[in-house]
Design a protein with these regions (language model features):
Chain A
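Nucleotide/pyrophosphate-binding catalytic subdomain
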Residues: 1-226, 399-400, 415, 419, ...
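Structural motif
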Residues: 2-4, 34-38, 77-78, 101-103, ...
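Active-site-proximal loop/turn and secondary-structure-junction residues that shape catalytic pockets
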Residues: 10, 44-45, 147-148, 242, ...
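Conserved dinucleotide-binding and phosphotransfer motif residues
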Residues: 32, 98, 232, 300, ...
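Terminal amphipathic helices with adjacent charged low-complexity linkers/tails
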Residues: 40-51, 238-259, 322
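Acidic/polar loop patches that form or flank catalytic/metal-binding clefts of enzymes
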Residues: 222, 233-240
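A conserved regulatory-domain signal marking ACT and ACT-like small-molecule sensing domains
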Residues: 246-428
Length: 428, 428
């Protein structure tokens, strides 16, 4: 008996049948004597439908007058958050019709307070003084994920995948014993099984590895949810909501490194196509120039990822290459053009057709030779590397998008990820 | 220059094209120097879509266990209110893209406070301390209609058509000069033009008449919106949102009787198929018996309409016949069965296939002979009258539903409603 948070993504609540199936999974935990808070996403496809409505109107500017009436992220949030509002109410009804007391909670009702960065807000605080007693009183709390309330009393949203972060933050605020993330896959894999059919489900993975994988494009968990869980040492279990009754569904436990137990150098290969490469040509060679670029990007709310400074062979001037999320490219380019004088560069080049491929593993800390294996595997297939970035536990390369599948397969093979290196460990 | 409230129903915001058209109508008023609050309904079809999701889950009770987990109106409200949330955000974006400052306001953000009768809540108070200054500051307020917040901090809704009431109440709270209700018809007609093609648009109609027509099934305005407007003497203009550019769109002005100016005895013929007839057989003949029936209905939140007490020819016992809204019939029957001993009756009969047909007119106050004309017209067509109810300005009869069109045409003709009795009056 304890307090648990369960989170169900869009495909898990895609229609009434799925919502009923979710209510059965929740009922099982309630019957086991747990206090349960459930975090739900919008029904699959609903967020896209709403976003497409917003985008169509957003584009209604007279020619040449970009964003004529200003930012619309506040209204985007109010519109898109309605998707989770619907699902939370529906699941609350489904729970009641099983005879289980339940009520929905919207972000502003909890309240889950965020900063003012509409459409990519960050959680500032979750009030537990209303929802906590309601749980203790035997009510299932069905929480609309992805949403909160900003200081001006408007609805805010946490960005795509934000429901994971809602769930983890709620679990921390409610001092829950664990957070189970139900999704449409049965755990975290060594790589995308659509590209490498031999990819293997991991029984456990360290927070740090999951963080890198999530940052690198493995879309199972939102990056910030993993950061949060790591900071508070909250174990997350990733498992499928589609398990057949009676069938084992251990999922993957994302937990502290000491608990992972499996010995391996590389845990997984990730890739992200949502990348764009920007190169600033012939930069003025003054101190603080990179800081100015980063400030311009940060002011525009654009996250800069891989950064490389180099010397152009043709004119011996300094160039700066970095990557941003592909959907931020236009904003980034506009911000850089506006700051061209301030930063001091001659021209901008950009490329949307790039993919970041990465190998990740806690074991890289104490093993050498990973980079060499990686670069050799890519070179053997004639794949050219544009940019390299490394951290303690990962190596990322930026390559031409058309080599994506080839690169992922080559690396999965080079690090023998299809083979189990340790006996499977059962999740608790 | 003044302050106006404009309200757009579901068909007026049915898709992005219509929302853009609405933004043009709003822009016109802004350009004329007005402060404008716009109240919007959900996109046409959206409320039905959401209600059907709710209904499907609501029906998930084990056989024999009706409403096993209790009332779900609170969750219904939270789910269905999302429709207006989306439209308000979309129209705010459309306004901004015309270069006009605008923001959406949800019921809880204003706040528009209601009682706790979820799914048919009544407005208790509209706070104008936030929205008023925002308007005065030059922002268009795009208000999600139909919704408010109840004392427990949950979303409440005002019942079908509630956006009209939102608009009128907001106009009163904001001390607006007028309230324009844009809809898919170009005004109030003498009767339903689908049944009587010769039906005529009225230039003006008295609050009292509109109130009867609205109560009687003319679906252009919600009853409570008319009551409110009458109590505060706020003129409502009903006009179409589909007018062709440059074409006259006077609509119908709903206003104080003295301002109607058109002389006529009967203004319109209304009908409502959303009726069900209940008869309690062999009632115990004790004082307060009807009061007990009314209390049972009121406790179940069911509105009782026409009431007739009679003596059964067969056994000389007292019977009580009354009508309720068809969608309340099951609730009403359940409540009556539960109170059978308390009220004291032998059996219940009910009939769903009944229609209420009514003639309405301020002039009936000072003219006799209306009832005679009405009953003769129906008798000539062999239409049997089940129940009769009258007020100062209307006569209603309950008939078998299959005679609905025949009865409406007969009455429209009997009162010469296709002829203009006074020269048309132009709305201000």
């Amino acid at each position: 008996m304890g307090r648990i948070v369960m989170k169900f993504g869009g495909t898990s609540v895609a229609d009434l049948e799925r919502i009923r199936a979710v209510s059965a999974l929740v009922a099982k935990e309630v019957d086991a004597g747990h206090e349960v808070a459930v975090v739900v996403s919008a029904m699959s496809g609903e967020t896209n439908r709403l976003v497409s409505l917003v985008d169509a109107l957003d584009a209604d500017c007279p020619p040449g007058e970009d964003k004529c009436g200003g930012d619309i992220h506040d209204e985007y949030d109010s519109i898109v958050a309605s998707g989770e509002q619907v699902t939370s109410g529906l699941l609350a009804i489904a729970m009641r019709r099983r005879g289980i007391r339940a009520r929905s909670w919207l972000g502003w009702q909890i309240p889950l307070r965020t900063d003012m960065a509409h459409s990519k807000a960050r959680i500032a605080e979750i009030e537990s003084s209303a929802i906590g007693p309601s749980l203790a009183d035997g009510n299932v709390a069905v929480v609309a994920g992805f949403q909160g309330i900003s200081d001006d009393g408007r609805i805010s949203t946490l960005g795509r995948g934000g429901s994971d972060t809602s769930a983890v933050a709620l679990a921390i605020a409610l001092k829950a014993d664990r957070c189970d993330i139900y999704t449409d896959v049965d755990g975290i894999y060594t790589t995308d099984p659509r590209i490498v059919p031999e990819a293997r489900r991991l029984n456990r993975i360290a927070f740090e590895e999951m963080l890198e994988l999530a940052s690198l494009g493995a879309k199972v968990l939102q990056v910030r949810s993993v950061e949060l869980a790591m900071n508070y040492n909250l174990p997350i279990r990733v498992l499928t909501s589609m398990a057949v009754e009676g069938q084992d569904n251990p999922g993957t436990l994302v937990c502290h490194e000491d608990q992972t137990m499996e010995e391996r150098v590389v845990s997984g290969v990730a890739y992200s196509r949502d990348e764009a490469q920007i190169t600033l040509l012939r930069l003025s060679d003054k101190p603080g120039m990179v800081a100015k670029v980063c400030k311009a990007m940060s002011d525009a709310n654009v996250i800069v990822d891989m950064i490389v400074q180099g010397i152009s062979r043709s004119d011996n001037a300094a160039n700066l290459t970095f990557t941003v999320g592909e959907r931020d490219l236009d904003i980034a380019l506009a911000a850089l053009e506006a700051a061209q004088e301030e930063i001091g560069f001659k021209a901008i080049k950009h490329d949307r057709d790039v993919t970041k491929v990465s190998v990740v593993g806690i074991g890289m800390r104490s093993h050498t030779g990973v980079a060499q294996t990686m670069f050799e595997a890519l070179a053997e297939r004639g794949i050219n590397i544009e940019v390299i970035a490394t951290s303690e536990i990962k190596i990322s390369v930026l390559i031409d998008s058309e080599y994506t599948e080839l690169a992922v397969r080559a690396l999965h093979n080079a690090f023998d990820l299809h083979e189990t290196k340790a006996p499977p460990v059962t999740a608790p």
